[in-house]
Design a protein with these regions (language model features):
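Mid-domain catalytic core of redox enzymes
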Residues: 221, 250-384
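N-terminal glycine-rich phosphate/pyrophosphate-binding loop and immediately adjacent elements
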Residues: 3-138
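Flavin-binding catalytic cores
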Residues: 358-367, 383, 410-450
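A glycine-rich dinucleotide-binding beta-alpha-beta segment and adjacent secondary-structure elements
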Residues: 188-201, 367-373, 431-498
Length: 523
């Protein structure tokens, strides 16, 4: 006889772990199934030759969600403030508070003196959105406050809720792609590039402009970002939840309420929470589909995954002082004022020749914006004495890398990318550091796809460029995002709501678990 659970959670990223934690908190018998041996998904820390590297997200923005969730579950571990710096060419500035926006404006004006007035108007837009953010994330998300103090409810939550309604309406109007939106204020494409090219393609204006608030909200867990899934898993196991890693789901039968694992085991569920790739989910459903299910399946299959990244992990024989003086612990670095709009992408990439692709890659890596992170500058134990681990990443096309693989030059592409990135960094910010690089590792969009099992290696769910979004994208409707057209099957994670990120993954994980709890109480 097959095993049976009140709820099965498929996917061991933070969304699935959150769902599982709250299911067990509410004493709902549950099993989490994860295809990889390791939990965490895009939140992971790995070690290589004594250096710790964060493989996915580099730091956490609380957004009124992460810390309240941990407090609600009684999970404690130390964090430090994560300071972000922004560098363009030879100039840089640290984001230390709201007044840092003044220095950011001055830096842009020094670089683009003819655009001083336009820059001032753009900064006014950023301040406006920061005002919205202060309201939207100004208090702990009430979803994670189980026992509400009546005084808190009356004096804090209700006034906040009234402001929230007003500000969410204002924010929801800023859905235009950020590049299009900024052209209202300037026609200088180079200026637009340095402001937005580290955002995902066609990121909505509100989401992009809000990042200046989110940067101030970043924290870093001592021990690396992987401490979060590690502590979540400990909580689940301590509360008698079951976790099965290294095992994937290959079939879902909604009619029989069963999942079939890749080892042939069939398990019965009352409720199912899918916290993994949605294309995989709709490809493995067995049985007949009604019109709503077929329509969603068709939409998912014709939609594109969001942007993915190219990452280089470096072990460098330079101490923390060298990197603290030049980049800090977390930096967004644009080496060139010639932005990505000047880089010509092969229109028909599936037909592009090797030489053309390498030329494109070199030019792209010279003009892109890099996110750089030094884990050991927040926690000295994360690198050998006198050394520093450096993570350097940039958005990069999945299609280009796939074409490189098809042409049989994938390994050459990785080596070329590392060589080019090292040269660009040496010339722009780290003089003399190449000879001190002990080792380098390169993770491409194909690596992301293989390791995370996310379609096209996407790191934030669906692309903003999709004509019709397969997920909910209205903040007011986020509670409905976890529902699917299939009876007693819910969803959570980065494919569930757009725009996504770690806080949204955690939030939807909690919402999905709440739906299961609600249905159980109604029986």
């Amino acid at each position: 006889m097959s095993k049976s659970y009140e709820c099965i959670v498929v996917g061991g990223g933070l969304a699935g772990l959150t769902s599982m934690a709250y299911l067990r908190k509410n004493r709902i018998s549950s099993l989490l199934v994860e295809k990889r041996e390791k939990l965490g998904g895009l939140v992971e820390t790995f070690w290589h030759q004594g250096f710790a590297f964060d493989a996915g997200i580099r730091a956490f923005e609380n957004s009124g969600i992460i810390f309240p969730m941990l407090k609600d579950l009684g999970i404690e571990f130390p964090f430090v403030k994560n300071e972000v710096t922004i560098g363009i060419g030879k100039k840089s500035m640290a984001l230390e508070g709201k007044n840092s926006l003044i220095r950011y404006e001055e830096m842009l004006a020094d670089l683009f003196p003819m655009e001083r007035e336009s820059i001032g108007r753009i900064m006014a837009e950023i301040r406006k959105v920061m005002g919205y953010m202060e309201v939207l994330y100004g208090i702990d998300n009430p979803l994670f406050i189980e026992k509400m103090d009546p005084v808190y409810l009356r004096k804090t939550l209700l006034p906040w809720f009234m402001k929230y309604q007003v500000n969410i309406r204002k924010a929801s109007k800023l859905q235009e792609p950020i590049g299009v939106y900024l052209r209202r204020f300037t026609e200088n494409q180079a200026l637009i590039d340095v402001i937005i090219q580290h955002f995902f393609e066609d990121t909505p204006a509100f989401f992009a402009l809000s990042y200046f608030s989110l940067y101030l909200d970043y924290s870093y867990p001592l021990g690396g970002t992987g401490k979060l899934p590690e502590k979540m898993a400990e909580y689940i196991l301590e509360n008698k939840g079951e976790i099965k890693t290294g095992t994937g789901v290959v079939k879902v039968n909604p009619e029989n309420r069963t999942v079939t694992l890749d080892d042939g085991e069939v398990i019965t569920y009352e409720k199912l929470i899918w916290a993994a790739d949605q294309r995989s989910f709709y490809s493995m459903i067995e049985g007949g589909f009604d019109e709503k299910v077929q329509a969603q399946k068709n939409l998912v299959e014709r939609s594109c995954g969001g942007d993915t990244i190219l990452t280089v992990f470096l072990g460098v024989e330079k101490d923390e002082t060298y990197f603290q003086e030049r980049c800090g612990s977390h930096r967004f670095h644009t080496p060139s004022l010639e932005g990505l709009s000047t880089v010509h992408f092969p229109v028909h990439v599936e037909e592009a020749k090797e030489k053309e692709l390498f030329r494109y890659t070199e030019e792209y890596l010279e003009k892109t914006t890099y996110e750089m992170s030094c884990p050991s500058l927040r926690d000295r134990s994360l690198a050998p004495l006198g050394c520093t681990g450096l993570v350097v990443s940039t958005l990069f096309s999945y299609d280009v890398v796939k074409r490189m693989e098809d042409l049989g030059v994938y390994e050459e592409f990785k080596a070329f990318s590392v060589k080019t990135i090292l040269r660009v960094l040496e010339e722009s910010i780290f003089p003399g550091f190449q000879e001190k690089v002990r080792f380098s590792l390169c993770a491409t969009p194909l690596t992301m796809e293989k390791e995370t099992h996310n379609y096209q290696g996407a790191i934030t769910g669906w692309a903003f460029t999709n004509p019709t979004m397969p997920s909910e994208d209205r903040f007011k409707k986020i509670a409905n995002s976890v529902k699917t057209p299939l009876l007693d099957i819910y969803q959570c994670g980065q494919w569930t709501f757009s725009p996504s990120g770690l806080p949204v993954s955690i939030l939807t994980g909690k919402l999905a678990a709440d739906q299961v709890k609600k249905k159980k109480e109604q029986r």
